[in-house]
Amino acid sequence: MSKKRKKSFPSRYILVTFVLVSGIVAWFLFAQAKSKGQIRNVLLISIDTCRADYLSCYGYKRKTTPNIDALAAEAIVFSNVISPVPITLPAHCSMLTGTIPPYHSIHNNAEFKLSESNVTLAELLKANGYATGAVISAFVLNSQFGIGQGFDTYNDKFEQVHIAGDIAERKGGQTSRIAVDWLEKHKNEKFFLFLHYYDPHDDYVPPEPFASEFADDLYAGEIAYADHCIGQVLEKLKELKLDKSTLIIITADHGEMLGEHGEDTHMYFIYQSAVKVPLIFKVPGRQKHKVINKTVGLIDIAPTVCGLLKIPSPPQIQGEDLSAFFGKSNPELRQRYLYTESLYATRYGVNSLLGVVTDGWKYIQTTRPELYDLAKDPAERTNLIEQQPQRARILQDKLKQILEQTVRKIDPQDRIELDAQAIRNLQSLGYVAGTKVSDDFEFDQTKEDPKDLIEFHNVYRRATGLVHKKQYDQVKEICKKLLADRPNFHELHDLMADIALMQKQYAQALPYLYQGLKLKPGRYKVHHNLAVALGKLGKSEESVEQFKKVIELAPNDTQTRNKIALELLRQKQVSLAITQFESSLNLDPYQPQTLNTMARIFATTSDKNLRDTKKAIELARRACELTNFKQPATLYTLSIACASAGQFQQAIENAQKALSLANTAKQNTLAMKIKKHLQSLEAVKPNLESGRSSK
């Protein structure tokens, strides 16, 4: 034994020594990498709805962005950066994939999800050993839209949201706190962190002291607040001594029109105020400020990061690696033609806006096309289409060429159908969830020009915003005026029906629902609302027929199957109701409310052929498991099921737990029901026990 120990000692000593030396060498190399300014980490910060000209480092008249300014003073600043679309989801898809909307097929918020055939920057960096994380500040970038591809952690769940839990966004301060925690956790790994700040998006309500300091320009105040929050993250990088080894990129998805050209906010037009964004690269090891005036795009971020990290870019990337600009001299590059679009106006039945931007010039294709000399006319006030037809034709040909090379057919599976909560989330952010945009890129000279509908768009958008504020009477007055102008715009009929349903005016909702379906048939949500209204009016059979149409149009909609089942229960068609509940659970077995309802049916039905106490207990227990035995309603049902099977002790114990939880949650009505149920159990149990003892 002793000889073996002596023999093993040298090898163990060598192993320990090797580990120690390896650790020292690794630390030395890491420290050396820091000192030499090599890129170890990547931090990409996107400020939603941020015009480039509102940053003080881009020349804004007031000091809005001191933290970004300090970073920019030692960074490469691009002064002419074009977003391919002034809409949050598609713009971020372009930012992370390096491709334009015709290729990645995302043209609007909440209508599409990013196909897995696309390759994101997060996927590329994860494949190269980076820890990948994202902190998202608005529902519009929720992972259900496919943009979370490649992220190890994608924080899009809002524990606290703006304005009393009613707005599907989080403030920048909370975003920064989550980011700081993430950095602390991953400080010893090489990482890619994507941060999304939503604060400059309307409504403009910056917190103090920014609200007072920028009382005359609240949009600028929101940008100043976002800068303050970004500063907290940059300070954390310094504290962790990661600032010298982290590539920091600050940009935006799009700008904001602020009333220019008649548009209140963004999404509709593609003028420079909406599509010109900041882009700043702070590269480790480089401290000299440099401004690049060349026209570049948001799609250049992904290939530039790949170029700096010596990672091959996927062949489908349409952006260009800008790292050649980061040296002492500027490279000679070919002339760029940057694509930009808004298909948003097509929802009103008018033409799209498709544009191309090159150094100093911009062409917009629509019913009345536009050409602007951006060098002399940055506000795009003078349309030169008639004065310079040859230049317009050249740019039109370039636009046609871009589309021919990039447009891909959309996979129907990548279209999104939103549930009611998702629609409310979007409305809370000021977005209109309704008609799909037209993405066929067909141009029809006979269609109206989007410019002619901007006031209609602004008013309609304000009306949908008032819905979230529950100013229903005002919404109805606006809709009636808009209907006088465009009586065949089905979304107005849908909105009038929605308001009537919210006010429980079911009879008033019916004509708008029927007219909406007449104008645009085959929409399952409208059939669903019609079914609800008919059910509330006591027209159960008609209601069920409408619900069946919903299932034909959306066969995987479990909520509709559950609602059909409830209508059948009202008609006392218990067996048919059970069939619908079962079909719903076959599609999604993780529905505690549906399991709970079925358990109650099997435990209490008067039909002896359907009564099944064993199944009732099984379903009720499953509902309790899915809610961690913390929901009083499911425990109450489990108690009822146990009692129906004669398991009175278990029934009493579950009822006691349910009562305690209901009292804690202040669910007084439910607590009273449970208390009566418990009293009846306690009254029955002694009689049963005495009956057993007499035997």
Q: Residue locations for each model-derived region?
A:
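Helix-start (N-cap) detector for alpha-helical repeat units in TPR-like alpha-solenoids
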Residues: 456, 490-491, 524-525, 558-559, ...
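Structural marker of alpha-solenoid helical repeat scaffolds
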Residues: 485, 519, 553, 587, ...
